[in-house]
Curated annotation (Swiss-Prot):
Molecular function, one GO term: zinc ion binding
Binding-site residues, Zn(2+): 97, 99, 117, 121
Family (UniProt): Belongs to the class-I aminoacyl-tRNA synthetase family. GluQ subfamily.
Record function comment: Catalyzes the tRNA-independent activation of glutamate in presence of ATP and the subsequent transfer of glutamate onto a tRNA(Asp). Glutamate is transferred on the 2-amino-5-(4,5-dihydroxy-2-cyclopenten-1-yl) moiety of the queuosine in the wobble position of the QUC anticodon.
Full protein name: Glutamyl-Q tRNA(Asp) synthetase
Amino acid sequence: MYTGRFAPSPTGLLHIGSLLTAVASYADARSNGGKWLVRMEDLDPPREMPGAASHILHTLEAFGFEWDGEVTYQSRRYALYEETLYRLKTAGLVYPCHCNRKDWQAGARRGTDGFVYNGRCRHPGQRPALQGKQPSWRIRVPDRDIGFSDGIVGSYTQNLARDIGDFVLFRADGYWAYQLAVVADDAEQGVTHIVRGQDLLVSTPRQIYLQQCLGVPTPQYAHLPLLTNAQGQKWSKQTLAPALDSNRREQLLRQVFRYLKLPEAPETDRPAELLDWAVAHWDMDKVPKHAITAP
């Protein structure tokens, strides 16, 4: 059975880009007779906004969304992540990293998603002294291409050794890394389809590699075009995207429908009816592949 999900982070409030992802993932799930889960990705407490998680859920309800089952909070799933990391340790796929980020990045080259780790701690004899600090844990990556067929973008491939380097699964500050948590959650929740923004396209080969290492299924992926401001910057919390205004629900939903190339919906003041229209007329093939300017 199709199982999709929407996974916001409570580092801020929902904005127009969040709404586009929510509508697309919801419409794709419901149009395929599937479930739509909501997962709160609250992995990084220092970056979270107090009250954002509950505000996000209330906003989703105000815009007519209905999810299946209970909301999942990553902050309550550490035991799952510990078990997942243990499996990778047992398989000899991960190692402790004692490197200071500033030091290893000083001589590192840039890859697809930031600096490529130089592999210093791969070899026990080369690891610097810890000096009482706990290490991070990295996974060894293969020197081969990992690719997939995206439902919107098409073919996408990375060589993890060349483009990314061994990446962190558990941070030295004691927090779980996104890549491990999202793979563990998707597998445990039986997620079969992931519809999300193209800012996460670059993370997908890492997640597929982790799925292969853990022997869990790889979902089908579709990465949505990003919404950008007049300066070409992605609308986000960092670029001060305004929070969704529940008093403008119909207007904002219709705006997102236009971005997703949905036909114009009939007049109604009920958000749930607008979402039903989106589900009935959903066509992934019509979704644009490239960024959309959203004033």
